[in-house]
UniProtKB/Swiss-Prot annotation:
This is Diaminopimelate epimerase. Gene3D superfamilies: Diaminopimelate Epimerase, Chain A, domain 1 (3.10.310.10). It catalyses: (2S,6S)-2,6-diaminopimelate = meso-2,6-diaminopimelate. It comes from Hahella chejuensis (strain KCTC 2396). One of its GO terms (molecular function) is diaminopimelate epimerase activity. The gene is dapF.
Amino acid sequence: MLIKFTKMHGLGNDFMVVDLISQHAHFRPEQVRRLADRNFGVGFDQLLIVEPPGRPDADFRYRIFNADGSEVEQCGNGARCFARFVKENRLTNKKNIRVETKKGIIELIVNKDGLVTVDMGAPRLAPADIPFVAETQEAIYPIEVNGVMYEISAVSMGNPHGVLVVDDVNKAPVHKLGKALENHPRFPERANIGFLQVVHRRFAKLRVFERGAGETLACGTGACAAVVAGRLRGLLDRKVEIKLPGGNLKISWEGEGHPVMMTGPAVRVFDGQVRI
């Protein structure tokens, strides 16, 4: 069957977006992997699905599948693209859009300048909520990889993140160490791994090795988790600009119990049809 889709990106983190309100389909993991292939398929980091909400306080249901076919809880860059998609496709005329994810409700705001602000909700820091194997909640945890000890912060932004502070993101072993930490036994559900370089209290650089996708040009939840980790370590102010390989995001966080706010672009690349 033929399915209509839209190719979008947020800072180079690219998505295939499918409206399953006006059309019907079911994506099996092997189909997602085939579509994600950049040589033989559409090519994307994640597949984003727009569905009717399953609860009365939401406007839509938002589902995310990684390129390896696994379904994940959250994607910040995808959320911005989701907001622009439902507005431009006239699926809603609301300015503030409430979206149901696997880990709860997030709120999306399409600004007049075309940027999208996402209320990502409050970060979860208790080890059991991330999940991360630790006896008590700390800002920094020692973690061993191949006999070497590292210091990591563990944060959930609806999906699990580990954040390391590095001197230079360009020299950080993102692929080797990122893969090892993604699959570390202390992250039972695997994790996205961020490498954070603090330039000054309101500006930082970040590279992210995403769970199930590898390093991407940008990771919205990773940027949020990095600011939370930086704030918990006393390195960052409440409003920070994060420079990722694909561009910049503005992140703000007042502190524990408060939501993380993320603002950045969402770009529509093209519309197409594909047979599944």
